[in-house]
């Protein structure tokens, strides 16, 4: 159940987009994302130029997401609307065929997770990313998920590069198989109620 397609999409909503935790996606969530991404990308500082870029990216992201998913045009995207948009625009598709808003967010997410900016998400960065969303009493649980996620090429390279991250993220959203390795992209998942 934790790795079902439905739960994976709910996970994305709760932990990546619904920043104000009100159960709906709206413009405020993306304004908050601009602030958060600026601070995370800048390692605690708040450069105005980086914020201006992030603010524009997140405003564009919200506008495109609202166009794709706000079916009733109320200025909010419900979980059901988001799921329907993902089914329509992402399911069964590769990263290259995702809407621009989704591709932009995926690329920004990679830069956020790649803490040391070496172009790879290694196990240490993966651990940091996982614990930022959920509690774990055993680091082995996280490491096991990372090992299930990585293929031989990832392990040989010392981590997951941007192209592979894009591929995995696309599979996380588009592949209904609960056993695909991409299910572990964000660590051991919890069931979202």
Each model region followed by its residue ranges:
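EF-hand and EF-hand-like Ca2+-sensor regions
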Residues: 61-193
């Amino acid at each position: 159940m934790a790795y079902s397609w439905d739960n994976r999409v709910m996970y994305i909503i709760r932990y990546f987009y619904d920043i104000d935790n009100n159960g709906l996606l709206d413009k405020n969530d993306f304004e908050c994302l601009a602030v958060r991404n600026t601070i995370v990308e800048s390692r605690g500082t708040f450069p105005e130029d980086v914020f201006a870029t992030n603010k524009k990216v997140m405003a564009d992201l919200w506008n495109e997401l609202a166009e794709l998913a706000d079916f009733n045009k109320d200025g909010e995207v419900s979980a059901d609307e988001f799921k329907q948009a993902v089914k329509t625009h992402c399911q069964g598709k590769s990263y290259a065929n995702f809407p621009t808003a989704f591709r932009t967010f995926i690329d920004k997410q990679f830069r956020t997770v790649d803490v040391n900016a070496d172009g790879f998400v290694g196990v240490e960065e993966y651990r940091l990313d996982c614990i930022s969303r959920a509690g774990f009493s055993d680091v082995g649980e996280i490491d096991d998920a990372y090992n299930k996620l990585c293929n031989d090429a990832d392990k040989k390279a010392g981590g997951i590069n941007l192209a592979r991250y894009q591929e995995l993220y696309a599979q996380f959203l588009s592949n209904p198989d609960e056993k695909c390795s991409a299910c572990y992209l964000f660590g051991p998942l919890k069931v979202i109620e």
